[in-house]
Amino acid sequence: MKKINTILAAVGALLMLSVTGANSLEFKAGVSANGMAAYANAKETLKDANGRTTNEEAILATSFASAFVEVSSDEVMGLGIGISYAPEVVDLEKETRGIQNHLGETLTAGNTASGVNDTGNQIIDGKIQDLLSVYLTLPVGDTGAYLKAGWIQATLITAENLTTGSKYEDIDMTGTQVGGGYEGVLGDMAFWRAEGTYQRWEDLSASGSEAGATTGGKNKIEAEVGSVTGSLSIGMKF
């Protein structure tokens, strides 16, 4: 629903911009090859383990394709609004952890997992897809350079197999992006772009599907995520 509302709002903005005068409008459409580097600081709290927490830092690098459409107007200093979409961003690396939480076993100093016996393999897996961006662009004079800022959303599909039988729900990731780039001409109607952006994602949080028998709490995972993206694009203008 959030994505639908965002798309409707963007389309409405496009229509409002279009009434400024057909002769001043320029429409663009194209495809992009993107490279992204992301950093995450995650914390997982296990149920029925005296609040046992696991902290982990991770760095991710991935590449993906996207498509975009834009409209801009000379009557508002060349200000443009656009929408880009990438159906698949990254398949997260699958990780298997051996868990042996025997009754009364001391997990960390002074932390005993009394009453817990979740022994087995914990499989961590997932993917990020449906990356949607709604953004504004503003040219820097006639230099070909431009500034960019916008809103982003993606879906983190979780596919974890926890020893406790609990599962995490999928997470809607939202955030903002800022950056800039350079646009060059390829003939009369084609163009190319080189662009760099920084994405600031809102903090992520998800709870497990099953409550613990001892405390009634649930597994919980929290994460802070940031990313940078470089893009090369080609497109047509009308």
Regions found by a protein language model. Give the residues of each.
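Cleavable N-terminal export/targeting peptides
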Residues: 1-28, 238
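Short glycine/proline- and aromatic-enriched beta-strand/turn motifs that initiate or cap beta-hairpins
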Residues: 21-89, 104, 143, 153, ...
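Membrane-embedded beta-strand positions of outer-membrane beta-barrel proteins
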Residues: 29-33, 81-83, 136, 147-149, ...
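Outer-membrane beta-barrel translocator domains and adjoining extracellular loop/strand segments
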Residues: 39-53, 91-102, 152-172, 204-215
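Predominantly the C-terminal beta-signal and adjacent terminal strand-loop region
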Residues: 53, 86-91, 102-106, 111, ...
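Outer-membrane beta-barrel strand-turn architecture
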Residues: 71-77, 128, 139-144, 184-188, ...
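Detector for outer-membrane/organellar transmembrane beta-barrel domains
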Residues: 78-90, 97-154
